[in-house]
Amino acid sequence: MRSDDLYITTVPCFFKCPISLDVMKSPVSLSTGVTYDRVSIQRWLDDGNNTCPATMQILQNKEFVPNLTLHRLIDHWSDSINRRADSESPESDTPTRDEINAAIERFRIENDARSKILRFARESDENREFLAGKDDFVAMLVDLISDSRNFSDSQLLLVGEAVKILSMIRRKIFDRRRLSNLILTNGGDCLTSFFLLIKRGNPKLKIDCSAVLEFIAVDAESKLIIAKGEGLVTEIIKLISSDSDSSLIEANLSLLIAIASSKRVKLALIREKLVTKLTSLLTDPTTSVSVTEKCLKLLEAISSCKEGRSEICDGVCVETVVNKLMKVSTAATEHAVTVLWSVCYLFKEKKAQDAVIRINGVTKILLLLQSNCSLTVRHMLTDLLKVFKVNSRSCLSVYETKTTHIMPF
């Protein structure tokens, strides 16, 4: 037995949730200063407990704050563990460029050739740049992806590996527009392949598909072509669910953000009930900070059209956005404020205004004005307060003693 077979990963104790004893995926801190995994502490509080599990102190409030510093440390540690595992793999010997040139010639017919190219691409930025600079190789990958006429299991594997390599080298491809044209001007065959891979592939392959599609969404025309791909958007939105892997959700949200620029695309997303999906994610306590930011950014884009605002103002979406105004991240705050500014101030949607007042959203707006927010956000918050002063002056009266100094009017 090799010595590295006996290697056991030691998890730092402060990376473990005191409740589950597992590595925390979304660390949050209570008012006592103790950090827990969001899922575990939310379950503890939902069960009616009002104490900190570790210290047994009675909680003055049940709010928790994302521990972003610890989250980054855990991510860094996890990445280092994965890199060490890869470096200890018996397959870690990197092929030479001459071997790669020979492997490219045999790519279609030999599994070993494809594995060799994948190992080469994983090794370094220089290797990925080398592959991306070979126009004939990139064109061959696109040609393989477009062959969706006979999608057998073996063909699915071949096309999937082509997508995986293309995803790995995409950021080293200098001419994005040329790649976009290669993929999108072949009668739709490539988009059909992407649809089948997203429908039938494993989560990692689905992420690679979304990453490539996001990369080639370079202008209004390409974004519309992707959005109109048969069944593609429908399948992507299906995967935006709390049941899905967080990385997969994030990749799909990034793709939707990339294509949601024109009104036609926004209407297509609205018809697929995207707002309902986003609201569901935002109300889920296990949703990560980055996914929350992307959900709010999509709502911001959708709020620019009438149909989008109608969806946002129905149900609990507005209340959910108000709840994300604080204690998530600066980006989340900016997107949430913009959504509220759009529906409440710019387009004066009565339902949205009523919802903000109903859940005491004006308090959070006032508190945000006292925070270190950007000048743009401050202007939008001031506009919002003007709306609520006109529409419901009584809702501000209780704050006049402590917050008069920040009132913008």
UniProtKB/Swiss-Prot annotation:
It comes from the Eukaryota. Pfam families: U-box (PF04564). It is an enzyme of class 2 (transferase). Its EC number is 2.3.2.27. It catalyses: S-ubiquitinyl-[E2 ubiquitin-conjugating enzyme]-L-cysteine + [acceptor protein]-L-lysine = [E2 ubiquitin-conjugating enzyme]-L-cysteine + N(6)-ubiquitinyl-[acceptor protein]-L-lysine. GO terms for molecular function: ubiquitin protein ligase activity. Residues 10-84 form the U-box domain. Keywords: Repeat, Transferase, Ubl conjugation pathway. ARM repeats lie at residues 178-218, 219-261, 263-304. Gene3D superfamilies: Leucine-rich Repeat Variant, Zinc/RING finger domain, C3HC4 (zinc finger). GO terms for biological process: protein ubiquitination. SUPFAM superfamilies: ARM repeat, RING/U-box. Pathway: Protein modification; protein ubiquitination. The keyword Cytoplasm does not apply. Functions as an E3 ubiquitin ligase. This is U-box domain-containing protein 28. The lineage of its organism: Eukaryota, Viridiplantae, Streptophyta, Embryophyta, Tracheophyta.
